[in-house]
Amino acid sequence: MRNLAAIIAFALLLPAFFEAVSAAAQTSEEGSIELVDPKVLRVCADPRNLPFSNEAGEGFENKIAALLARKLGKTLAYEYYPGATGFVRNTLNAHRCDVIMGMPQGDDLVQGTNPYYRTSYALVSKQGAGLEPIESLEDPRLQGKRIGIIAGTPPATNLAVNGLLENVKSYPLVVDTRFDAPAALMIGDLEGGRIDAALLWGPIAGYLAKHAKIPMKVTALVKETSGPRMIYRIGMGVRHSDQDWKRLLNKLIAENEAEIIKILASYGVPLLDENNALLAHQ
């Protein structure tokens, strides 16, 4: 009787056991499934962040995304969200889109693809102002100059190391791009003579200088001997579970390298080779 009771008790527990196993397996499976839309290239983007992206599709990331969509035979759709705190969490990781364009290689928030360009922070000055030959923030000709800097960006450290903070004008790093454009404001101050030089992320520097009211010189900061790194490889970001999707994007990047570089160059992005020299077309 004791054995029979044990058998009955075991039998009664079996359904619950298998249900638990099934649920665990399903959870594991869902964690590994790539939830990439098969018909639509869903891109996470900032709605007002030129030269990278905007809702009108005028940024170079918009153009690269359109190129990839054509190659994939997919329609293109966007999930727009201001590029501030919570961007990855509320877009890619919320499964509202499947790829973020323009992610620095090594960013742990996403799984990065192979890079599709290499660039650096840059120094922008007015043509004819005498600062054009400067190639490094260590140059003594910068002493006493009024320099614009986005707060908290790598060049700020180099300004401190080289004793250039006295006349620095700081602009905010984290803003809602729907309302504020600190980089454009900085270039406006440079045009108006309120600062003598501007330090900006290369793609922004090149684009704004290209569209400035007066001729500007953009110098990629590739000769710094101290401070944080100025040069970065830029790829795309996908979810950590999306291995096949990452491999497909890597294939597309390799196959369309020339077209991607052409798009970037048309926006004035300072493009560097592996020896830190500007690519020949620039």
Predicted regions and their residues:
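Bacterial N-terminal signal peptides that target proteins for export
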Residues: 1-8
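Periplasmic-binding protein-like
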Residues: 46-47, 118-130, 210-253, 267-282
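Ligand-binding clefts/hinges and TM-proximal coupling segments of bilobed small-molecule sensing domains
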Residues: 26-27, 33, 154-175, 217, ...
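C-terminal segment of classical bacterial N-terminal signal peptides
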Residues: 13-22
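Bilobed "Venus flytrap"/periplasmic-binding protein-like clamshell domains
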Residues: 47-51, 55-71, 123-182, 203-204, ...
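Acidic, polar ligand-binding/catalytic clefts
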Residues: 66, 70, 75-141, 152, ...
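Extracytoplasmic small-molecule ligand-binding "clamshell" domains
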Residues: 27-108, 177-180, 266-267
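Alpha-to-beta junction loops
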Residues: 73-75, 93-102, 145-146, 186, ...
